[in-house]
């Protein structure tokens, strides 16, 4: 797997400046940008759309979108729209990536989100979204997701399948395993020890084996905190 370098954007800078950062990152060969959406600050879909229209090659992903804030069909429609907006990379891959998370406390309970059974809720959301990305009509009956003959009803745009990679912002062992089992991979956390990362990758591998895949086939982007200075 080729070494890559990306950026993780939150809301630390003026929006116009962050768009300039994205253009600079693309010019310098960065592979991707992940836009945060865990706080009630900047909406990742709005920011991702802006980043996509101000760049032409770099990949843009959500890092990560809480599954409790939107219906999975709406999530699929939003990412399908960004897929059309962005076009493909020079290698023919989707420029847009979908990172999903189970949100966190206390913000979730403060807005009335019911985070029970996050593992099951995550599985159902990903299965439904992945099915909708085929552009076929689907029905899904789960505890958290119910879809009755639903499809991405694109009338004038491309109806090609949306080969959009899906990631989980996973921290615990079971969610890490799920990311290896049904996703393109996890988005690994930052400000953690190397021992934690080694164990996390081991959990991802357990999940990958359940679906008959090798760990080498699982993408594993990791967030890193760093401080830059003009001084040597």
Predicted segments with their positions:
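N-terminal beta1-alpha1-beta2 module of alpha/beta enzyme domains
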Residues: 1-60, 164
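Active-site mouth loops of central-metabolism enzymes
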Residues: 3-16, 65-72, 161-171, 226-229
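Hydrophobic faces of well-ordered beta-strands that scaffold small-molecule active sites
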Residues: 5-9, 33-35, 60-63, 96-100, ...
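Active-site-proximal loop/turn and secondary-structure-junction residues that shape catalytic pockets
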Residues: 11-13, 39, 66-68, 102-106, ...
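Conserved strand-to-helix beginnings and helix N-cap segments that scaffold or border functional pockets
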Residues: 18-19, 45, 72-76, 198
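Glycine-/proline-rich flexible loop or hinge segments
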Residues: 31-34, 58-67, 107-111
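Internal, glycine-rich beta/alpha segment that forms the wall or movable "lid"
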Residues: 74-185, 190-218
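Active-site pocket-lining/capping segments in soluble small-molecule metabolic enzymes
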Residues: 232
């Amino acid at each position: 797997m080729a070494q890559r370098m990306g950026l993780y954007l939150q809301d630390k800078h003026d929006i116009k400046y962050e768009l300039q950062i994205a253009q600079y990152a693309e010019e310098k060969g960065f592979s991707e940008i992940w836009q945060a959406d865990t706080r009630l600050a900047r909406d990742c879909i709005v920011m991702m759309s802006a980043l996509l229209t101000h760049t032409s090659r770099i990949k843009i992903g959500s890092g990560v979108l809480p599954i409790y804030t939107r219906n999975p069909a709406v999530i699929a429609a939003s990412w399908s729209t960004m897929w059309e907006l962005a076009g493909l990379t020079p290698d023919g891959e989707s420029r847009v990536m979908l990172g999903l998370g189970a949100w966190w406390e206390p913000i979730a309970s403060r807005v009335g989100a019911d985070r029970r059974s996050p593992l099951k809720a995550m599985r159902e959301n990903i299965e439904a979204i992945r099915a909708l990305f085929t552009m076929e009509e689907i029905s899904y009956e789960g505890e958290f997701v119910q879809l009755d003959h639903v499809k991405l009803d694109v009338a004038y745009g491309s109806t090609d399948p949306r080969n959009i990679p899906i990631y989980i912002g996973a921290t615990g062992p079971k969610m890490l395993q799920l990311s290896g089992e049904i996703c393109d991979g996890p988005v690994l956390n930052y400000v953690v020890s190397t021992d934690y990362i080694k164990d996390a990758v081991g959990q991802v591998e357990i999940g990958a084996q359940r679906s008959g895949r090798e760990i080498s086939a699982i993408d594993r982007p990791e967030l890193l905190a760093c401080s830059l200075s003009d001084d040597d």
